[in-house]
From Swiss-Prot:
It comes from the Eukaryota. Belongs to the LacAB/RpiB family. GO terms for biological process: carbohydrate metabolic process. Keywords: Isomerase. The active site is at 76 (proton acceptor). Its EC number is 5.3.1.-. This is Putative ribose 5-phosphate isomerase. It comes from Coccidioides immitis (strain RS) (Valley fever fungus). The keyword Transport does not apply. One of its GO terms (molecular function) is isomerase activity. D-ribulose 5-phosphate binds at residues 16-17, 77-81, 110, 120, 148.
Amino acid sequence: MAATPLPPLRLAIACDDAGVSYKEALKAHLSDNPLVSSITDVGVTSTTDKTAYPHVAIQAAQLIKDGKVDRALMICGTGLGVAISANKVPGIRAVTAHDTFSVERAILSNDAQVLCFGQRVIGIELAKRLAGEWLTYRFDQKSASAQKVQAISDYEKKFVEVN
């Protein structure tokens, strides 16, 4: 019996000036992938654009929250700043991952919608491979991890209500 094909994902892609070349390379690499239905580029588009990473990360994460895209790929120098920023949007789970196992578990264990790379940390060929693998994973709402992800969401709601 053949496996059910995975539905294609709507992606956002974002970077600061430290991630422009990887963003462009990854966007080109993913644009022909059948698991991608669309890519929304929220910038930046040039190394001369000094828009700080929090702005583009929040913009891309908000697209997920608003249901306009399914996931986002973000690149900065380390991948850490964009992840921290994206995680400020309620309901968003962003991770920085530079290896196969972490990319897999980001989806299967944590239902992370955002994958972040550091252009100064990871080679472009590995980034392309990991981004391609990332597209093949889907979170199982019936998995043992679902309760843990729900606990994260519950805590988030609790703290949002308090503040």
